[in-house]
Every structure is written in C-alpha cells, then in structure tokens.
Amino acid sequence: MKRMGWAVTAAVTTIVLAQSSLAAQAADSTSGWRAPSCTKVTGDGAVTFTTDDGATLAPTTGTLQSVSYTHGLVALDTPNTLLATHNDELQRSTDAGCTWTKVATLGSGSTWLTAATGGRAFAWEKNGGYLARVDGRTVTKLSSPSADIVGVGTDKARRDHVRLAGSDGQLYDSTDAGATWKPLGKLAFGPGASVYTVSFDPADLDHAVAGGMTTGGAVTTDGGATWTAATGLSATAGGKSNLFAASVSPADRNVVYALGIDLVEAAPNSGAEGRHLYRSTDGGRTYTRIVDDTPDTELTNSTLLAPSPVDPNVLYFEYGTYFQAYGTDLYRYDARTGKVGKTHNAHDGISAIAFNPARPSVMYLGLEEVQIHH
C-alpha cells in the first residue's frame, strides 16, 4: 500500500532565504550572465521561463502547433546563451531566453542536451544512437560507441573530455570531443542487464549513478572500474527494484535524486504501483523514499527530475497530461521540511528544465504539446 502523509502546499512563489544567498554567490561566480529582460518570449512556444517556481509563465509569441517535445534544454557558459531541442530542431537564444531561433536540423526527432565548457554542448538520442557536438551554431555529427545511449557527461576541467553510457551499462571515454571512443571500466550491473539511465556527476566524471531494470541502482566513483550496488530502493531486504532516472545534485555531489519502483511493493494483485522518488546523501549508495505516487504528487516512469543548482535540498519534478485537458503540475520538494509545493499550468507537459546561471530562481521550461487544443 502507498504510504500517506506527504504534505502538499499551494503554489510556492518564493525561494527560501538560503537559496537566495546561494543565488547571489552564483551571480558573483557567473561572468556575463543576467536575468531575462523581457516579459514575453519570442519563439515558437517551445521554451518559456518562470521566476516564481511556475506560478506564472512568461507568455510566448508562438504556440506549439503539432505534437512537440522539448527534451533538450541547457544554459551554456557563454553569457546569456541557451540551447534547446524541439523535435528535430536545434534552437538557440543569446539574450538569456527572450528570443529563440532555429539554428540547425538534427538527425533525430528526440534529442537531449548535455552542456560542456567553452560554449559547447552534446546532443544525443536517449535509447538511440544519434550523437552530435554543438559548437556555437555549428553541429558536428559524431559516431556513437553505443546504439542505445542512456547518458552523457562532460568534464568542466577538460573541454574535450566526454563520457557516454550505453544501455548495457558500459561506459565509454573520449578525450577528443567525441571523435573517438574507448570502453571504460566494467558493466554497471554485469552481463545481460538492461540499464535505463546513467547520470554523471557534473563536478566529477568518475562519479556516476546507474539505474537498471530489476537491478535497482549502482554507483561508481572511479570511472566504472568498480560499481557498488545501491540499497534502500525496496522496503524489503534484498527486494528487487527498477531505477528509471537519477540526477546528481549540482550543489552537492553527495546528494542524488532518483525515480523508481519497489517491485516487491508492486507485486501482481497487490493493488500498489510502488513508484517513488528517492534521495541519497552518500552519492547514490543508499536511498530513502521522499515522495510517493499519490493523487497529490503524480509520478510516472518518466518523471522529469531537476535538482536545484544551488540548493541540494530542493528538487523540481513535474506531471503533465493532455487527458481531459488536465495540464501540468510543477512540484518543488524541500528536504528540510519534507513538503512538496505545487504550481499548475495549462501546457501538456514539461520535457526539460534549465536554470539561469546568475539567477537560479529563473527557471527555463521546455514545453510539450501532445494534443492540439482548438
């Protein structure tokens, strides 16, 4: 049965003081970035922004006109520059998210983005083989070492150093910006495992968290040379679990947020789905349940996880559906209180979230259109 008692509050419109002070630190350390100066976003409607945790969204000049997903969205270290992937389009903004223009057509209709240093990013197809490097407005197609990519990580200290993970749990390493690759370390769960995700620590490529089908989670801190099985994903000792997604907090490498299912709890005829959000404070070795799948906090197997870049206690996640024109809930979990705040908008979903490097209270949202509304 689902555990009860998660407190859900109404629209959260302020950022806690601790995060405000951290945001000031971020502004000091982020050269050239500023908050968007516009009140309306010029673009096709794929990206908007909010300054109040989603209580209000900046209107857009365009409206999404077809089934659309914006899976890729990153803020670069080039001042005021962001990239987004809307279906097979690569879009770019150079004014902190006020204006978006198409710069290229990509070789996949569904691509994620991982930012690198020097104004670079990598575009990649989740559970597919498409891979490209984006330098400014130039897109260079790369050969992926895996036909089923489940994660890409970059090195802040070495611009050309990038890692990639395949759905078998194998890591690959490149020191020439993705031109060539070599296998690295051992399989995350051994031969025959199906891996949903590998999340790389943005501060340390050697630290990565893997999630698998029935195998739960695993973590490496030595670039895949060794992997340690995670505990706490099932309430039953030795119980199996699925770990669909994980994200290492940019604010504290010891904090990892994850999405999974306790397969013991979700056993046939149990009446429970066993779906939860989890939090680890030891880098992904042990997890504690923090949010259950309830009518107040809806979770799916693909719930988006977006940890705050400045506050390791804060996680944003979302639930959206076109069914009965429900719209989208944007949630904010705070580990200090265990409470979840919620705001609502009319869009069909949020596919991606990025944060303004100088003003982390400015959140950029990649939007979905699943059913055209007339």
Curated annotation (Swiss-Prot):
* Keywords, comma-separated and alphabetical: Secreted, Signal
Predominant localisation class: secreted
Does the keyword field hold RNA-binding?
A: no
Q: Which domain of life is it from?
A: Bacteria
The signal peptide, as residue positions, is 1-26
Transmembrane portions of the chain: none
Subcellular localization: Secreted
Whether RNA-binding counts among this entry's keywords is: no
> What GO CC terms are in its UniProt record?
extracellular region
Q: What does the further note read?
A: On the 2D-gel the determined pI of this protein is: 7.1, its MW is: 39 kDa.
Function, in words = Induces autolysis of dispase and thermolysin.
From the Swiss-Prot or TrEMBL record, give the protein name.
Dispase autolysis-inducing protein
